[in-house]
């Protein structure tokens, strides 16, 4: 019984891939699993003409600075309007 329990624990850990499982938004509705080395989620503003802008949602290792940007390190945290 102990062997079965140990096997289930090992299989669970392998399936979860604990070392690389951060999930971030890649658009307003789509999500992605971040590649190795990218340990933060980010939403940053890209300026257009006449003072308008749009947001880029992505995984990153280094976040952009800016008043409207979000940089965080927990799953699906880059959709909010505040950093976390």
From Swiss-Prot:
Residue numbers binding Zn(2+): 50
Domain of life of the native organism: Eukaryota
Subcellular localization, as worded in the UniProt entry: Secreted
Gene Ontology terms for molecular function: acetylcholine receptor inhibitor activity; metal ion binding; toxin activity
Tissues expressed in: Expressed by the venom gland.
Signal peptide as annotated in the record: 1-21
Disulfide bonds: 24-41, 34-59, 63-71, 72-77
Role of this protein: Postsynaptic neurotoxin that produces potent, and completely reversible, postsynaptic neuromuscular blockade, as well as broad spectrum inhibition of human muscle and neuronal nicotinic acetylcholine receptors (nAChRs). Inhibition is potent or moderate, depending on the receptor (alpha-1-beta-1-delta-epsilon/CHRNA1-CHRNB1-CHRND-CHRNE (IC(50)=2.56 uM), alpha-4-beta-2/CHRNA4-CHRNB2 (IC(50)=1.8 uM), alpha-7/CHRNA7 (IC(50)=7 uM), and alpha-3-beta-2/CHRNA3-CHRNB2 (IC(50)=12.6 uM)). Acts as a competitive antagonist of ACh.
Protein name, entry field: Fulditoxin
The organism's taxonomic lineage, starting at the top: Eukaryota, Metazoa, Chordata, Craniata, Vertebrata
